[in-house]
UniProtKB/Swiss-Prot annotation:
It comes from Hamiltonella defensa subsp. Acyrthosiphon pisum (strain 5AT). Its EC number is 3.1.-.-. The gene is ybeY. Its main location: cytoplasm. This is Endoribonuclease YbeY. The lineage of its organism: Bacteria, Pseudomonadati, Pseudomonadota, Gammaproteobacteria, Enterobacterales. Single strand-specific metallo-endoribonuclease involved in late-stage 70S ribosome quality control and in maturation of the 3' terminus of the 16S rRNA. NCBIfam families: rRNA maturation RNase YbeY.
Length: 151
């Protein structure tokens, strides 16, 4: 049986109107369980200030972003289920949903799925890699009952 453990941290000043822990657990498990049987992931929901600080500190980009992924690199001799951390900026997710005319919960789900795939080693730097990652994201989103996030 798969065991995907979620540590949800809410660091937003206003925590009203956020998806609940069950939502995040479903989205995370749906993204990870096809690839790993056991994993632990922290999802930290933040405001724009913290997102901007982390984005600058780790990527030298001085603005907030929707999701940051920090994969955990396990020492070779120590098999741990820790997969990594996702930092998701509430305000950016909400703004993007409006600008892209997407249902808010669908966009939250997409950010979790997208970030989880980064933790699993997928990226979208090269065009072929982007196509593969987007295809997997779309499949997971449709499994969850959401539309293709790239349409």
């Amino acid at each position: 049986m798969n065991q995907i453990i979620l540590d949800l941290q809410i660091a937003c000043v206003d925590n009203q109107g956020l998806p609940n822990e069950n939502d995040f657990q479903l989205w995370l498990s749906s993204a990870i369980s096809p690839f790993k049987k056991n994993a632990e992931v922290t999802i930290r929901l933040v405001d724009e200030i913290e997102s901007r600080q982390l984005n600058f500190q780790y990527r030298q980009i001085d603005k907030p972003t929707n999701v940051l992924s920090f994969p955990f690199i396990s020492p070779v001799q120590v098999p741990l289920p820790l997969l990594g951390d996702l930092i998701i900026c509430r305000q950016i997710v909400e703004k993007e949903a409006v600008l892209q005319k997407k249902a808010l919960w669908a966009h939250w789900a997409h950010m979790v799925v997208h970030g989880a795939l980064h933790l699993l080693g997928y990226d979208h730097i090269l065009n072929d890699d982007a196509k593969k990652m987007e295809s997997i994201e779309t499949e997971i989103m449709m499994y969850l009952g959401y539309p293709n996030p790239y349409d």
